[in-house]
Amino acid sequence: MTTKYELWYIDMIKKCKSYRKEQKITQSEVADGMHVYQQDICRMENCSNIPSVIKFMEYLDSIGLKIVLKEV
């Protein structure tokens, strides 16, 4: 069963993928910045391999984004 947090995480990954493409950043460029293989980025963006929070933050950094927390 997928939790609401997993669904949110998957949605964030998809939005980040769209942003990366808008910025014309390739998966290879992201992979180089993260010191992983291009295939790892492909799997992450297609949600066949959900990254740890640390890897997701590295991904965000490599495409020029960051997480901002706010009180709810």
What does each model-identified segment do?
Residues M1, E71-V72:
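Short intrinsically disordered terminal tails
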Residues M1-D11:
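A detector for short, charged/polar N-terminal pre-domain segments
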Residues M12-K17, D40, S52:
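Short alpha-helical segments used as structural interaction elements across diverse proteins
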Residues K14-E29, E58:
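Short basic helix-loop element that most often maps to the first helix and adjoining turn
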Residues K24-C42:
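Short alpha-helical DNA-recognition segment
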Residues S52-K70:
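DNA major-groove recognition helix of helix-turn-helix/homeodomain DNA-binding modules
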